[in-house]
């Protein structure tokens, strides 16, 4: 059960992992100033490190648990467990790449703006989803279009 709890990466746990409180904007503060960029850099780096630790734990777990079971049912169960873990790690590897892309945007001071329309994404949305690259309006439109294409 402990391992399952560690895998939850809600926005609140991402902030907790990074050891940061939600950002408190000051009146008249410029959007994506140095303090805000540092805040998100800390969050993204901590999230990336946590995911890398998970990948390392999985590799160690699979090496430790690898056994050649004579019983075909036991062997199949172990292979299914490993397959599920590998799919999860693959998703996490893709997320790590997205985090690294986002960190590059932070470094280039191009972070926090919608890639579609250029407006500010917003501090709260970015704390909830630090890798967001669309504002809520553009994301909603993209989801509606996606739904129409699928339906």
Swiss-Prot record:
It holds the Pfam family DksA_N. Induction: Expression levels are constant during exponential and stationary phase (at protein level). Negatively regulates its own transcription, translationally activated by CsrA. InterPro entries: DksA_N, DksA_RNA_pol-bd, DnaK_N, Znf_C4-type_bac, Znf_DskA_TraR, Znf_DskA_TraR_CS. Keywords: Coiled coil, Cytoplasm, Metal-binding, Zinc, Zinc-finger. Interacts directly with the RNA polymerase. Signal peptide: none annotated. This is RNA polymerase-binding transcription factor DksA. One of its GO terms (cellular component) is cytoplasm. GO terms for biological process: double-strand break repair; regulation of DNA-templated transcription.
């Amino acid at each position: 059960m402990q391992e399952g709890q560690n895998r939850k990466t809600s926005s609140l746990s991402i902030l907790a992992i990074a050891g940061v409180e939600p950002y408190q904007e000051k009146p008249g503060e410029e959007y994506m100033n140095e303090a805000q960029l540092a805040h998100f850099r800390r969050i993204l780096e901590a999230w990336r490190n946590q995911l890398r630790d998970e990948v390392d734990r999985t590799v160690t777990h699979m090496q430790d648990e690898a056994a050649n079971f004579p019983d075909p049912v036991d062997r199949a169960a172990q292979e299914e467990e490993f397959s599920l873990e590998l799919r999860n790690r693959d998703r996490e590897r893709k997320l790590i790449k997205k985090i690294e892309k986002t960190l590059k945007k932070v470094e280039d001071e191009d972070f926090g703006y919608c890639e579609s329309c250029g407006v500010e994404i917003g501090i709260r949305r970015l704390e909830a989803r630090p890798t967001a690259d669309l504002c809520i309006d553009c994301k909603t439109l993209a989801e509606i279009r996606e739904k129409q294409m699928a339906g």
